[in-house]
Regions:
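Conserved nucleotide-state-sensing and coupling region of NTP-binding domains
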Residues: 1-38
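A glycine-rich helix N-cap at a beta->alpha junction
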Residues: 2-10, 117, 121, 128
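Short, conserved catalytic or adaptor-binding loops enriched in Gly and charged residues
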Residues: 12, 20-24, 103-109, 142-143, ...
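Active-site donor-binding loop signature of nucleotide-sugar glycosyltransferases
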Residues: 33, 117-119, 155
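A short acidic, often aromatic-flanked loop/helix-cap motif at beta-alpha or helix-coil junctions
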Residues: 37-39, 121-126
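A short acidic, Gly/Pro-enriched loop at the edge of an enzyme's catalytic core
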Residues: 42
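Signature of the SF2 helicase/ATPase Hel1-core->accessory helical subdomain module
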Residues: 45-122
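ATPase catalytic-site recognition across NTP-hydrolyzing enzymes
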Residues: 124-166
Length: 166
């Protein structure tokens, strides 16, 4: 009820599917997974949530497939003036986030505002100290290995070789 007091829009009575529903004011929600078909649809807002899995780290073609899906599917469906939100765990220097960041070196390509939340801030304090104590984060870092730590916790993927100090 609190939601309904703030937002007057309602779901249409016949909207029952979790991955697709319409509002009484003409809005639509449509969800697919990576590699899912979006042909014939337009979008004012695209939200891409975790296009990679942990298993993708061991499959370079999975990163290529996700990028190909994005560029030939969802990106092509974005209406003029539309927006894209990409929320993901960083996994690799070849993941979708890195590919999009690299592409923006072309001034005509999509330009992204990147918002990152590293587990440990430059001042050495946890980004979320109420949940993660620095001692716990240091334990994760020591247990996970530097490459995983840099990618998943610090939002700064490196190759396994790049994570080693020689």
């Amino acid at each position: 009820e609190e939601y309904q007091q703030i937002f007057k829009t309602r779901l249409q009575e016949d909207s029952k599917a979790a991955g697709r529903w319409n509002t009484s004011d003409g809005g639509e929600y449509f969800a697919v997974g990576v590699q899912g078909a979006v042909t014939g649809r337009g979008a004012d807002l695209l939200i891409i949530d975790d296009p990679h899995s942990e298993q993708d780290v061991n499959s370079p073609s999975a990163f290529d497939n996700a990028y190909e899906w994005y560029t030939s599917g969802p990106r092509q469906r974005l209406q003029p003036g539309g927006r894209i939100v990409l929320v993901m765990t960083r996994w690799s220097t070849k993941d979708l986030t890195q590919r999009l960041i690299n592409a923006q070196s072309n001034e005509n390509a999509d330009q992204w505002e990147v918002v990152e939340f590293p587990a440990v801030l430059p001042n050495g304090k946890p980004v979320w100290p109420e949940y993660w104590k620095i001692e716990d984060l240091n334990s994760v870092k020591a247990s996970a290995g530097l490459a995983k730590w840099n990618a998943q916790y610090m939002q700064n993927p490196t190759s396994e070789e790049g994570a080693l100090i020689k």
